[in-house]
UniProtKB/Swiss-Prot annotation:
Molecular functions per Gene Ontology: peptidyl-prolyl cis-trans isomerase activity
Keyword terms: Cell outer membrane, Isomerase, Membrane, Rotamase, Signal
Gene that encodes the chain: plp
Keyword Coiled coil (UniProt): no
Official protein name in the record: Parvulin-like PPIase
Family of this protein: Belongs to the PpiC/parvulin rotamase family.
Length: 284
């Protein structure tokens, strides 16, 4: 079984300790208490994510290292809860203010999530999916690699070496300031043109103008100077509804909430008493 990804619950979310049946095996003891299998299962089963898709039914289904980890998390939460109770920290004014702020934020988050759920319809999803698919049809994605350096001179020197037959991946590993891609021969991965949140326009425009295996002249961006190489070009795959669900849900949620907040501001007759420049900057 693959190693489980265990979510450490915060002390504030610790549920009350369930009464355990005497037939449960005791898996740990501590001063003033003991831990039974059923308590671990009740506490953690809903929060466990198995990449393999397997279902956890019994405590013994967990690998030994995860059994130990779960027990320690469970007991540590109990011990810390007791320390909190002894400290009287929750009675301080500062804590009460933080608690009230946290409650307000949690309530607002719940409100917004519920609002999105009640206003995001199947038709909206289908319409947005169809629009998304249409926007991808006929588009091309490219696999790019780059070498990033500080100065134009460094970039030109690298370009000259490449023109003389130097290996791009080797130079990227030796010279690129982008350490994340340098360890992979400068490879960034696949990109689409004008896709929000990807790369800066100067980089994208130069990359999409290249042919496969062609290397660019030095390109300047806010990050420095780049030498770009296109490794592959292929059509953008059309995702299924399931594959696109998260992307589309996020887009629709943002639109729904933007309108909701705008309507609230309008109902409240909100007027910002700042100079126009500052007001316009805040809206960006």
């Amino acid at each position: 079984m693959k190693k489980l990804s265990i979510v450490l619950l915060s002390v504030s979310m610790l549920s009350s300790i369930a009464f355990a049946d005497n037939s449960d095996r005791v898996v740990a003891t501590y001063t003033g208490g003991e831990v039974r299998e059923s308590q671990i299962m009740k506490e953690f089963k809903p929060q466990l994510n198995l990449p393999s898709g397997e279902t956890i039914k019994n405590f013994d289904d967990f690998p030994p290292q995860d059994q130990d980890k779960l027990i320690r998390i469970y007991v540590n939460n109990i011990l810390l809860k007791k320390e909190v109770e002894k400290s009287n920290i929750t009675s301080s004014k500062e804590f009460q203010e933080k608690l009230e702020n946290a409650k307000n934020q949690l309530a607002q988050k719940e409100l917004l999530e519920n609002y999105v759920k009640s206003n995001l319809t199947d038709k909206m999803f289908d319409d947005e999916y169809n629009k998304y698919v249409t926007s991808l049809k006929g588009k091309e994605q490219i696999k790019v690699a780059h070498i990033l350096v500080k100065s134009e001179k460094e970039a030109n020197d690298l370009k000259n070496k490449l023109n003389k037959g130097a290996d791009f991946a080797k130079l990227a590993g030796e010279s690129s300031l982008d350490k994340a891609s340098a360890t992979n021969g400068g490879v960034i991965g696949y990109i689409l043109l004008n896709q929000p949140g990807q790369l800066v326009p100067e980089f994208e425009n130069k990359a999409f103008a290249l042919k496969v295996n062609e290397v660019s002249t030095p390109v300047k961006t806010d990050y420095g100077w780049h030498i770009i190489k296109v490794l592959e070009k292929k059509p953008v795959p059309i995702p299924t509804k399931e594959e696109a669900k998260m992307t589309i849900d996020n887009v629709l949620a943002a639109e729904i909430l933007k309108k909701y907040i705008s309507d609230l501001e309008a109902k409240a007759d909100l007027k910002i008493m700042l100079p126009p420049a500052a007001n316009n900057e805040a809206k960006k």
